[in-house]
Amino acid sequence: MGVSHRNRMCVFACLLVGLIGIPVWVMGASEIPGDTLYLQAEDAVSEGSYEQAYHLFMNASEAYAAEGNGGKKKEALRQAKRISWMFAEMTLNRTAADETIQTAFPNFTADEREAFLEPGASIQFESDGQVYYFEGIARNIQYHNKTLSQNFTRKLGESPFFDQISPYISAPRDEKNPLYQNHTFRGTGVLSIPRDQLPDTGTLQIWYPLPVSIDSQSDVQVLSVQPEEYVVSGPVTTGTIGEVYLEIPLEKFRDDFLNVSVNVSWTTSPRILDLDPETIPMYDTSDPLYLRYTKSQPNINITPEITARAHDIIGDETNPYKQARLIYDYILNTLPYSNVPHSYLAAMPIPESDFMHNTGFGDCGTQSAYFAALCRAVGIPARAPGGYQIVPGHQGTHFWAEFYLPEYGWIPVDVTVAEAADWAYNATPEQAKEYKDFYFGNLDPYRFIIQTDVDESFSGEPNPDILMTFV
């Protein structure tokens, strides 16, 4: 979603200040040429002085404005915005990070807290000589420790996902077992933006996600889109991503909130594995599907290091189904779930798969992209679909993974939901194994699927004049 630029610089500058938490200082635009300031900003970026670079890009935009160079002014603002996103979730200095850990885990000693502040022990980066820590540092400490995670679910009195799925895995697959039935859902999505957070005039561009029709998600119906008169294209519910695109003239709205709503219904089916792993046909390596899903893409990146890791994981195994299982087990057993600062990754930019490989930290999207990258690195087509998981009582955005086998099609894998067995205080070892086995090759019907792969894009590209974006 974006706002086209028409006298919007002040709004964009305010957004940057709010994100980065540092004031904008501007030298007289006539004192230093815009190109000089821009080059100084690029030098600051290369030196890791991102705050200094932010100020220099902002100053460059002012200098370019004074010089009458609107194109370069916008580019300088875009670069400043990119830097601001580095700091959007990396908000804690060392003292604040230590206090956050102490609040969450008051029984930790000072030395124990200090260990989590060291390089490699938490998500952090350095700018202008200061280390910044991810605001989710305490949550990640819990996720990386089974005892802490199980203490949390014990206190909660519930083991999310595990409690909702595990009892039905081995139960009779009859009409009383919801895990093996189709489910029809109806939902309304509402986007409500405070009017005072938007410019007075201009065009608000909105790409609103919708469910997409695939084998396990059918009978997709878009019942309404409001305000209907501003729909430019769509609704689209076929292909690789579901969407409806709107353009809203802001000068026509004066209410306290600008509201956009979509009402949809869809039917989901469980995906249950039924194959003989000993009879997997050979891949046709010239097939367009094979070529597409075994190459690098922005967030499923195949590096020499990832390729080496993938071969270490699979060893001498040549069966692609068994190779994928080895990769699944590797991630599940050695790379625990973590919250991730995606705005920081996008700004740097760092591919999701690279971040997981290099740091050991990853949420559902990062784990799924890494699974796909490891599979692709050994010649297994793979991808990372996404949307929402809608397990009763535990709805939220979600990604998982799929790998492709000839004659069988796309095989689902959900490392993240499988890991819920490790967080469950009430899971026996046998139950945990059964639950983890289920999520390799099978998928529950509690999904709202928007896109078939992580790097699928909405139709068209945002207007190049867009300066403000919302996630």
What are these regions (language model features)?
Residues 55-84:
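Short, charge-rich amphipathic alpha-helical segments embedded
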Residues 320-327, 360-375:
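Active-site nucleophilic cysteine motif
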Residues 267-269, 337-338, 361-363, 389-392, ...:
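Solvent-exposed loop/turn segments at secondary-structure junctions
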Residues 32-59, 63:
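Alpha-helical segment of the N-proximal tetratricopeptide repeat
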Residues 45-48, 238-245, 252-354, 358:
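Acidic low-complexity segments
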Residues 1-30, 401:
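Secretory targeting signatures
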Residues 35, 39, 43, 47, ...:
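Hydrophobic/aromatic-rich core segments of domains that either
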Residues 79-272:
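Intrinsically disordered, low-complexity N-terminal segments that are enriched in acidic
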